[in-house]
């Protein structure tokens, strides 16, 4: 067995022993927060920035051994991972009540789930990925982010900035397929917010997300509007599964950042319980969409 298949024994767990991400990372974070209008939010505070740094250090190191991301340059990690994740913060800040629960489907490198865990008043964040190596990374990165938040909460001088809601967030890596998590692990209609980024077609994403979302909860999918109206076609193609799985009318929210051209957030409310037949097995889903 190759060395790369043993990340638990050989890959680092402490981000503060690793090389800093550097000025390009910090500058891209600052620029992105400015574009998103978040400089006066918790996302721009020292605590949140420490979580971005800790997470990115581990991502860069682990990506040398396992396929987490092809994006390694610090400024691009900041822009294409951290800032892209935070692009939903203005929207989710209105939806995430104190103590809300969030699930990130296909979390992979921990984006967008971990930046949102550090900036929203959540009680639980689940990072779901069926690939074992990625789930082990998510566990390591989740622990690192949680440690930063816990340390901040114990420091009386920083507790006001961090907020008690951040201090008690439970971050869990879940090494399962979404289909298995829904019923075998008791997660059907368990989450206030279910998110996904770069997972698959919109129809696929919604069939996996809606069964995990509680009634009156919200699904958010990160998408891009390509030339030729690809997103409009995806929305039309997802109509039947939205109706069948209990979703409401989707809306498309443009991301107001010049550094993220064409980025969109597809948002819809869960209006009715999802029938037990959903999500269908992967083979059935693919066959029906041909």
PLM region descriptions:
Residues 122-126, 130-290:
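S-adenosylmethionine
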Residues 98-108:
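Conserved class I S-adenosyl-L-methionine
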Residues 109-122:
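Conserved SAM-binding loop of SAM-dependent methyltransferases across substrates and taxa
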Residues 1-2, 172:
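Amphipathic alpha-helical "coupling" segments that flank catalytic cores
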Residues 26, 52, 56, 82, ...:
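A general structural signal for well-ordered alpha-helical segments in protein cores
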Residues 2-98, 133-136, 140-144, 148, ...:
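Class I SAM-dependent transferase core
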């Amino acid at each position: 067995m190759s060395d790369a298949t043993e990340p638990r024994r050989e890959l680092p767990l402490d981000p503060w022993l690793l090389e800093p991400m550097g000025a390009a990372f910090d500058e891209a974070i600052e620029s992105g927060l400015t574009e998103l209008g978040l400089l006066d939010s918790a996302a721009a505070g020292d605590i949140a920035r420490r979580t971005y740094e800790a997470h990115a250090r581990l991502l860069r190191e682990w990506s040398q051994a396992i396929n987490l991301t092809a994006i390694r340059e610090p400024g691009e990690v900041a822009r294409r991972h951290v800032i892209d994740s935070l692009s939903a913060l203005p929207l989710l800040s209105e939806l995430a009540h104190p103590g809300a629960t969030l699930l990130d489907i296909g979390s992979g490198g921990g984006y967008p789930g971990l930046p949102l865990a550090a900036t929203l008043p959540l009680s639980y964040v689940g990072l779901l990925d069926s690939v074992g190596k990625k789930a082990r990374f998510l566990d390591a990165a989740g622990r690192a982010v949680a440690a930063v938040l816990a340390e901040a909460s114990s420091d009386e001088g920083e507790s006001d900035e961090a907020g008690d809601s951040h201090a008690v967030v439970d971050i869990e890596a879940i090494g399962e397929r979404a289909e298995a998590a829904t019923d075998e692990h008791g997660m059907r209609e368990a989450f206030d917010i279910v998110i996904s980024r770069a997972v698959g077609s919109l129809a696929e994403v919604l069939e996996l997300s809606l069964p995990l979302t509680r009634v009156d909860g919200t699904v958010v999918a990160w998408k891009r509007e390509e030339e030729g109206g690809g997103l409009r076609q995806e929305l039309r193609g997802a109509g039947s599964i939205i109706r069948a799985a209990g979703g409401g009318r989707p809306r498309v929210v443009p991301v107001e950042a010049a550094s993220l051209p064409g980025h969109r957030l597809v948002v819809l409310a869960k209006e009715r319980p999802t029938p037990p037949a959903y999500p269908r097995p992967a083979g059935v889903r693919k066959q029906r969409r041909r």
